[in-house]
Amino acid sequence: MKASMFLALTGLALLFVVCYASESEEKEFSNELLSSVLAVDDNSKGEERECLGFGKGCNPSNDQCCKSSNLVCSRKHRWCKYEIGK
């Protein structure tokens, strides 16, 4: 009886340790994944500073719309729009 109780408690303790270790790895993985996503988001913010995206307010005399996306600053509406026909 004492031996079976000892084995049962030892088994529960071992199960607790294994579950705790796997949970820690999952939390670490999710934190690492979140950090990498935020790092990518920070990099894209740097690109946004260089040029303005679609629908952003702009100044026609100082066109800062993204030329790589075929965007130009509309003189009439003063926002970045797609240039059609080029």
Curated annotation (Swiss-Prot):
Residues 22-49 form a propeptide. It is found in: Secreted. It comes from the Eukaryota. One of its GO terms (molecular function) is sodium channel regulator activity. Disulfide bonds join 51-66, 58-73, 65-80. Keywords: Amidation, Disulfide bond, Ion channel impairing toxin, Knottin, Neurotoxin, Presynaptic neurotoxin, Secreted, Signal, Toxin, Voltage-gated sodium channel impairing toxin. Residues 1-21 form the signal peptide. Expressed by the venom gland. The record marks 76, 78 as: Interacts with channel. SUPFAM superfamilies: omega toxin-like (SSF57059). The modification Isoleucine amide is found at residue 84. Pfam families: Toxin_12. GO terms for cellular component: extracellular region; host cell presynaptic membrane. InterPro entries: Huwentoxin-1 (IPR011696), Huwentoxin_CS1 (IPR013140). Neurotoxin. Selectively blocks neuronal tetrodotoxin-sensitive voltage-gated sodium channels (Nav) with an IC(50) of 44.6 nM. Does not affect tetrodotoxin-resistant voltage-gated sodium channels or calcium channels. Monomer. The presence of a 'disulfide through disulfide knot' structurally defines this protein as a knottin. Several genes are coding for Mu-theraphotoxin-Hhn1b for which the structure by NMR has been determined. The cross-references to PDB can be found in entry AC D2Y232. Belongs to the neurotoxin 10 (Hwtx-1) family. 22 (Htx-4) subfamily. This is Mu-theraphotoxin-Hhn1b 3.
